[in-house]
């Protein structure tokens, strides 16, 4: 089975990744679940020997690693994880699980903020007190969401072993005429090894009719970074917004 999976992803080795189906892994009813072929591709392409996954959701990563015969540990906000190798973890407030620290690669496919309209706490799993919703990235306004996600990425990057890799799959969102780009707003620690475009298939929005001036979003982005062997220095790039009144600028004409 492992060899069949490797042959399938190897035949599609490209910076534009296009897998028409999500594969037989995980729960396809779990909103926001990514294609298992993406995780399988990363394992093949980067020779991953053990994988950690944050925002493990519907169990896709666990199932892929089972079929590719490598150790796996996941973490998710869900108090009742769907697999026994997924830990209940609040990525916002909890420390990085010790089980994550020695893995070859950390994979993340985070929620995309409140703008996309996919909440998890209280929707995909019960949240009777409302406490989990406060740490649910899927319920945070965009700026709060990106600030929180960037802090999580840096926290988990700091805990990674030198020489290990992190892959983050992310998407763009348009809501009420405003375009939000995760790739534009996300922090990039370490050394960037590769960026990928991942084509979207079988989306809920595919059946909708749009005006001619509207461009449907048909892709996601992913970066793969590596933590340098020098464990005492953390280098990163983070976007920031700045506003200037041109009336106060000496360069204005």
Name each region found by the language model.
Residues 1-253:
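Class I S-adenosyl-L-methionine-dependent methyltransferase catalytic core
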């Amino acid at each position: 089975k492992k060899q069949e999976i490797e042959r399938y992803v190897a035949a599609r080795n490209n910076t534009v990744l296009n897998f028409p189906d999500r594969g037989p892994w995980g729960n396809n009813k779990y909103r926001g679940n990514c294609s298992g072929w993406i995780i399988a591709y990363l394992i093949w392409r980067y020779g991953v020997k053990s994988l950690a996954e944050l925002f493990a959701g519907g169990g896709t990563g666990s199932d892929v690693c089972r079929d590719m015969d490598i150790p796996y540990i996941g973490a998710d906000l869900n108090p009742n994880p769907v697999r026994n190798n997924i830990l209940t973890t609040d990525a916002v407030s909890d420390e990085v699980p010790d089980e994550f620290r020695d893995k070859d690669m950390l994979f993340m496919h985070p929620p995309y903020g409140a703008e996309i309209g996919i909440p998890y706490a209280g929707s995909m799993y019960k949240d009777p007190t409302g406490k989990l919703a406060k740490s649910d990235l899927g319920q945070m306004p965009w700026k709060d969401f990106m600030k929180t996600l960037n802090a999580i990425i840096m926290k988990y990057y700091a805990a990674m072993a030198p020489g290990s890799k992190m892959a983050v799959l992310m998407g763009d969102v348009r809501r009420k005429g405003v375009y939000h780009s995760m790739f534009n707003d996300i922090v990039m620690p370490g050394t960037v090894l590769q960026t990928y475009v991942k084509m979207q298939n079988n989306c809920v929005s595919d059946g909708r009719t749009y005006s001619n001036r509207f461009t449907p979003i048909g892709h996601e982005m992913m970066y793969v970074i590596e933590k340098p062997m020098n464990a005492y220095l953390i280098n990163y790039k983070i976007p920031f917004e700045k506003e200037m009144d041109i009336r106060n600028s000496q360069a204005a004409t």
